[in-house]
């Protein structure tokens, strides 16, 4: 049996993941509004596809659906973790699988909405049964980084897994550490284990849609959203998190903007500089997301323009997906 086949019982991914609907896109692309419109037309419930929306108390910076929006359509996998909790892709897949089965038992469709590329790829293609996260090893590596720096860590990866090293940017700390972690636990390169999960299905056979704005328009939307976040109390949200929890988990700190606001609260940047830094990092993250989505053969882009309404976009997606599987 081929363990790379998402229909395989050996894969972490379930075959019915491939029958679900997916709405993704870069940050600030309007996924929440379109997702609600689409879910209502599909008689679907929404499972969040956002790694940071899992965390409680991190509402403004993650742009979670509001309470009013959640009343329109049931939403799942929101506010399920403490800001101090670590969470992996494997953890997400298991939680999503349970929720998907529960929703299907009610006779309803499942719509995943969010912009975390790793989660999307894992749902569509599965993941290899790699070792669980070794937080003790990761803490030791973080200490090592303080002394020798990231270049030394990257050089170590080049020695044990040159194929992975060639694919990764020398500054991609998180994935460099994960590759070393897998090699340490299994004695095998992560690149060897991952190759069987690289093939995707044609877009025409899937219900996977990504919202795509012209770059200049998306940047305007991002800048406007960041301004609104700070006006809504983003700094106060982060201050409260630090007061209640002391620190955030490594995975929670991956949320765009939180490190920048923490630096501001520590007196290392004024507010205006912080706002601009968050805008710049968010734009960078949006480019990263779109690069990922373009690499997935399952994904169909939905071009948008100023004036596009959520209702119109949802109807367009529904028409495009109506023939899938027939």
Task: For each feature predicted by the language model, list its residue ranges.
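Phosphate/pyrophosphate-binding catalytic cores of soluble transferases and nucleic-acid-acting enzymes
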Residues: 1-326
